[in-house]
A protein has these predicted regions:
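Short N-terminal or domain-adjacent regulatory/targeting segments
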Residues: 39-47, 230-241
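A transmembrane-helix-recognition feature enriched in membrane-embedded lipid enzymes
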Residues: 2-57
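Proline-centered helix-kink/hinge sites
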Residues: 29, 57, 73, 89, ...
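Walker A (P-loop) phosphate-binding motif
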Residues: 42-110, 215
Length: 241
């Protein structure tokens, strides 16, 4: 069993062994510290501290759980829609596994690749590869990437890839993707579960998109919708495969 599979068997409760129980208890203690840190950080942003506002519209695409929820197809879809309307979007990516994500680097311009995957990281490079008419910039500080996009690339709109928890850059629309096959991250924040922050964070969302709905029974999807309606009744929920 791989490390990832073992971790999921523990946090999901599938592993009912004594060691599994001990591991869950230990992870639960760590989760309390993590949740406290996230709450302090979010409270700061709620007050507007440390938030940069730019001169062009910003759309954030993100999630509330660790793991893939289909952000790349959504970012590509939004870019396609915007370019068809004559706009010039630039995608801001953190650049996971980049050679140095402390630097802000233009990795593609108008669909032309400017760096190798070893520089940008595979995930951002593959995203840039499929965006034929958009620009992609990587860097941990999205506000700096935003400045580069606006001042050097002439971007008139920005898309933050994996931006829901990156609150240092103000956004006009927050789109949150929820994986229908594991929507609520085993009900616990990391590392006891897969939630990147408490579910109450969904109140910041403007749009919820349930992804991978074709991988679960219709009854499960309706159950997720019912729970979301109870938590965030005024936020629209859409579905995609």
């Amino acid at each position: 069993m791989s490390g990832e599979a073992l971790f999921k068997s523990i946090v999901s409760g599938e592993d009912q062994s004594v060691l599994g129980d001990i591991a869950r208890s230990s992870l639960g203690l760590l989760s309390k510290g993590y949740e406290k840190a996230v709450s302090i950080r979010n409270a700061r942003f709620d007050e507007g501290k440390g938030v940069t506002k730019v001169t062009v519209p910003v759309i954030s695409v993100g999630n509330i759980t660790a793991g893939g929820t289909g952000k790349t197809p959504m970012v590509r879809f939004i870019c396609d829609v915007l370019t068809q309307k004559g706009l010039h979007p630039t995608v801001l990516s953190r650049g996971y596994r980049a050679e140095d994500n402390n630097k802000n680097i233009i990795i593609s311009k108008d669909g032309t690749m400017l760096v190798e995957p070893s520089i940008s990281g595979d995930e951002a490079w593959l995203l840039a590869k499929v965006l034929q008419k958009s620009n992609v910039i990587i860097g941990r500080e999205r506000s700096k990437s935003a400045e580069i996009a606006i001042n050097e690339l002439g971007a008139d709109c920005l898309i933050m890839d994996d931006g829901f928890q990156h609150r240092a850059l103000a956004r006009d629309i927050d789109i949150v993707l929820i994986d229908a096959s594991n929507p609520f991250g085993y009900e616990h924040v990391l590392p006891r579960g897969l939630l990147r922050e408490p579910l109450s964070g969904l109140q910041r969302a403007d749009i919820i998109v349930l992804t991978k709905v074709d991988q679960v029974a219709p009854g499960i999807v309706s159950g997720i919708r019912k729970r979301l309606t109870q938590m965030i009744p005024n936020i629209p929920v859409y579905e995609t495969t």
